[in-house]
């Protein structure tokens, strides 16, 4: 029996929170104490999936997992119920938290209650309450659970309302521009990520050019996508060009286009990236690799808004916002005469620093959970868990390759764990990660790279998969994540490489 005083104390306690996150944690800790549960979670509903906002009694990596309704029938049942849902211990619907409770990783959840949370009859989230005893919540009535759900819905709705008001001035006019469940997203609750999100919100709805600075593998392309998604140009194209992968002979044509007969092989007119991005955004990745002659031509387009296709004297007007990214120190490149000072100042109107993973180690459990869930889906697994000791190993590692290195490490570990354990619910252990050697530096030749030793006890197919995965990862790292260059280095057709990477779980 839940007393009115207990509910009143929860309501008053929520007023003491200094931030949304603090209030959410107070809420679920109070719920766990009030209902004597083993675990509880507050989740937000968005884009066909539940996103954990706060957890108690669950492993930290749960905060990074995403529970798409189409992949999690129990979550779908909660979303569609419209009221309290009690799942019996013998429910045929798998519990998404099985194996994700500390000290209970070998046990299944036996008592589960789901409370869908609504605002004006619209689903905004859910509160899940779990226990290891099948009769743990039998003495609590549905009406009492509804009262708890009402408190949770009010707290979540207030947070969402304040979030909408705070973003109102910079929200894009175009509906449906948030990332869906299939799109990668920026994961993290650290102060560094909070600062990054704030900077994106500040600049997104302006027309300023943005220079994204950061090491390889930090997610500069995700930042560019977030800026574009929050802009008034969100409905127009976001066109991507990797300047580092451009041979000098075709770079000008890629940027500005050409007309038929302009040079040998120009058999038809071709629009360049600037034309394709007209009225939208052009993301120039690794801008520091452009040659000085091309920098001069790029500067002219930025200054006057017109360009000429190769072989054509007719100027074309374009309206393009530039987002550029680099892992180089462009200020030093200017001093050394490798980058034009006037172009640098044009591009760096609003610089954004993408934090390295070592600057936000507290986000590693969330990222690990996020990649585990994506890997689970790509490999067709029922569950994919990571041991606490393995998670601690990941948190201690320096990650010179940043988020990309972490993602590849988890995918490789998942392939090894699946082969080693022969299970649809494998657990990633410390020995599945080989982190001592670190990633290859960009200058290392993939053909000469030492391969990471494989664990014993693997069958031929599993060992072959693990070897192929490790070789692709190392070659990809050596070519700065460029798939076309990786395919050439491995002497593979690009399409075959992408299909192999998907089968191995390296790509979603």
From Swiss-Prot:
Per the database record, which ranges form the Sigma-54 factor interaction domain?
A: 186-415
- Looking at the keywords, is Lyase present? no
Question: What is one process in the GO biological process aspect for this record?
Answer: phosphorelay signal transduction system
Q: In which pathway does it act?
A: Nitrogen metabolism; nitric oxide reduction
- Cross-referenced PROSITE patterns, in alphabetical order? SIGMA54_INTERACT_1 (PS00675), SIGMA54_INTERACT_3 (PS00688), SIGMA54_INTERACT_4 (PS50045)
UniProt-annotated binding residues for ATP: 214-221, 277-286
Q: According to the UniProt entry, which residues carry 4-aspartylphosphate?
A: 56
* Entry keyword set: ATP-binding, DNA-binding, Nucleotide-binding, Phosphoprotein, Transcription, Transcription regulation
SUPFAM superfamilies, per this entry?
Answer: GAF domain-like (SSF55781), Homeodomain-like (SSF46689), P-loop containing nucleoside triphosphate hydrolases (SSF52540)
NCBIfam families attached here? Answer: PRK05022.1 (NF003451)
**What is the name of the protein in this document?**
Anaerobic nitric oxide reductase transcription regulator NorR
Q: Which organism is it from?
A: Aeromonas hydrophila subsp. hydrophila (strain ATCC 7966 / DSM 30187 / BCRC 13018 / CCUG 14551 / JCM 1027 / KCTC 2358 / NCIMB 9240 / NCTC 8049)
**Gene expressing this chain:** norR
